[in-house]
Each structure stands twice: as structure tokens, then as C-alpha cells.
Amino acid sequence: MAEVTFPQLIQRACGIDVHLKVVVATIDGVGIHRETRSFKTFTSSLNELKEWLLSNGVTHVAMESTGVYWKPVYKVLEDSIPNVWIVNARHIKNVPGHKTDKMDSEWICKLLLAGLLKPSYIPPKEQRQLRDLTRYRNKLIQQIASEKNRMMRILEDCNIKLSSVVSDTSGATATSLIDMLCEGKVLTLDDIKSVYHGKLSASPEELLEACTGFVEEHHIYLLQMIRKDISQTQQLVSELSERIKILLSKYENVLELLKEIPGFSTKVVEDLVSEIGLDMSHFPSEKHLSSWAGLSPGNNESAGKKKCPNHSRKQTGKGGNYRSRMDCDPYKEYVFQ
């Protein structure tokens, strides 16, 4: 059976099948014979891969976005090879059958030579570093919220009904009362009045009744541990925020303009810039940006019926999950403008 061929649009290319311990690379093109080699994923082996590609005059490299395994390969090649593409694995699926690493790399190389692959948007190194910081900060903020919820469950176990009379258990009054309970103190009406805020809907007497329960030594120990964990995590968040501020200091004028958008706080602006950057030339139109950010419905039609759009991780990828979780209305309005 004759081999299926495609018109060749790229002179010399390489397709790489990336794994945890090994990468399989196939080169092909004008003036070179198709060749497949395997390299370990240690830095020295990846440098050998780079030298092999340079010696053969390869100008385009494509690989699947496999977990985080592609990142070291990309970092080694991005400064030496003119075009290093990360492509969506769903866009380069081969026909089912005899699947091997060599066949996968050959298939990627064949598609790349024919100009049938579309590169994913990989931000510049500076933006990738900023994104690592903002995503880690958001993860820590989620941990703080989780620990606060754990604290409230322990208080409920003690029959402390603070959440029933206070709308915001993270407010100044509620925090002060929880701190007293963590110290093992039996609250009195004078204690309540000493931290009472006039804007609270509940009266001091109602707060006292809600804070009367059966707090045991076991509960106090757990509450103290959780409070200590929250304090340490908040310190890490502050340090990350300072680091992010330093990295964005040279874009202060642009950040101030973005903060003029109603509802855009400093953190929202920092998260926005880390995810989509400041260079909009990467996106042909606002529709491309909305789609990439996971904020626009996709086309999912079968038998003439349009199915409900679903922005799952399968459609948007891990990065899309981060972007779609920035679900504040101002962010969405900004992207759609």
C-alpha cells in the first residue's frame, strides 16, 4: 500500500514525542533523510538533542503539550531553534492502530512539514514566571479559605453558632471573638462589647448566646493549630504579592490604567496581566482572546442539535481552568470588550 503524503510547506522540521524519562524525536525535510532518535530527559541529553537539531538545520520543532514534561524541552530549545511549537494533543491524533513512540514522532513531523499544525500560545519567559507566582498565590488564598471553613466546622462541633448571627465570619468582630475562643476564654458580655461593631445586625446579647457552647481542650488545640497555619500562609501571600509587585514595577502606568476599570482591584489586574499578558498582537481578534480564555461558548453540534457548552478541562486545558476561575464580572466584561 502506498504511503499517504502531504504537500511540504516547511523545509526542515522535527516532531518530538515527550515522556517522563525519554523523548523521541524525528527529523525530516529537504536535503536530509528521515531519522528518529531517542534522548533521555536529563539536561545533558536535551542539550544533545538541541545540538543534533542545529547540526541538521532544523527550523521548526513541534511537540505535544504533555503535562509538564514539555517544559524542560521547550526551555532548552526556545533560544536556539527559531520556531518551537507546543500543539494541542487533540489536534494531532493519529488513526487508531499500531501506536508507538517512533510512529507518534514521525506523525507529528509529517504534519508539521505539511503546515497542518497550529502552535499554542506560549507566553514570554517573564510572563510565565509572573504566572507561576500569581497562580501559587491564588492557591494559597484558596488554602486560607479552606482552613477558615475548617475552623467554622470545629466551632459548629462546639455548638458555637457564630455563623448563624454574623454574615461575615472573617470580619473584625467575628475574628476577635474567634481569637478569644482559641485562647480558651469563656466569653462574657463585656468581652463581646469590647470588640462589638455598631454596624452588626446582631446585638451583643445575641452574640453572647451564639458564642456559648462546650469548647473542650481538644477543640482549642485544633483551633490554635488552624489559626497558626492561616497566619503563616497569609505571610506567604504577602511575600508573593511583594515579589509580583517588583516584577510588574516597570508596567506601573499600564496597571494604573487597568485599575480604572470599575471593579478591578490590584490583585485582579495582576492576575489578568499574568494570564493574558499586555501584548494583544498574539490574538487576531477579541473573539480569539475570549475563546482562549475559556469565556466563550464553543460549537458542539450533533444531528442538527446544539448541545450545552461545557468549559471543562478537556476543552480549555489546565490554563483555561485558571483563567475561567477568574470569574469576576469586570474581568469577563474586559475580555469581551
Regions found by a protein language model. Give the residues of each.
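A detector of single, family-specific signature residues
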Residues: 1-337
